């Protein structure tokens, strides 16, 4: 077990991201594994939880259209799960989004991924829908957001307001 005091969260430059793929392989399968590996190489920001200089978890983030943040993937090494690493990564992500002026943050999780849904709920994320997002942002803007987020059937879209909303 890793104590949270020993953990640092660091940016991972593009050229060093290959060393994180093993965490994705432990965390995802099928389409999610393929997409997470591709996203890892091209996403604007990857943060890794590090313990004794070794990665034990990661999160992939992107700002969509200036004031909207999106959490693409949170993945934690199997041996480190249930130690609060995912929560540390999500808290760090929210600090980054806030510092960059995000007014709201979205994430999507598989409808049967109870652990991920609980993680996001613990930080104030609530389920939303295309129609709810469209009411605020308009249909075309929402379609473009969904396209960038790659929300697929069988996923629940989650939202958190960051500032007076």
Describe the predicted segments one by one.
Residues 66-68, 104, 155:
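A generic structural signal for beta-strand entry/edge sites
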Residues 97-109:
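Conserved GNAT acetyl-CoA-binding A-motif
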Residues 76, 82-95, 118-122:
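Conserved acetyl-CoA-binding loop-helix of GNAT-fold acetyltransferases
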Residues 7, 11-73, 77-78, 90-91:
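Acetyl-CoA-dependent GNAT
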Residues 87, 111-129, 133-140, 144:
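Conserved active-site alpha-helix within GNAT-family acetyltransferase domains
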Residues 1-15, 152, 156-165:
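Conserved N-terminal entry element of GNAT/NAT acetyltransferase domains
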Residues 133-165:
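C-terminal "cap" of GNAT-fold acetyltransferases
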């Amino acid at each position: 077990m890793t104590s949270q005091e020993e953990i640092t969260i660091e940016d991972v430059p593009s050229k060093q991201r290959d060393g994180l793929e093993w965490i994705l392989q432990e965390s995802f399968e099928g389409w999610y594994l393929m997409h997470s590996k591709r996203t890892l190489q091209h996403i604007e920001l990857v943060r890794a939880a590090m313990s004794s200089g070794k990665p034990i978890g990661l999160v992939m983030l992107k700002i969509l259209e200036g004031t909207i943040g999106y959490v693409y993937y949170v993945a934690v090494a199997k041996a480190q799960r249930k130690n609060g690493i995912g929560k540390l990564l999500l808290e760090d992500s929210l600090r980054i989004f806030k510092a960059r002026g995000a007014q709201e943050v979205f994430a999507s999780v598989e409808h049967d991924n109870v652990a991920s849904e609980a993680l996001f709920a613990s930080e104030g994320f609530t389920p939303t829908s295309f129609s709810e997002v469209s009411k605020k942002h308009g249909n075309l803007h929402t379609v473009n957001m969904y396209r960038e987020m790659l929300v697929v059937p069988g996923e629940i879209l989650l939202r958190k307001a960051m500032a007076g909303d």
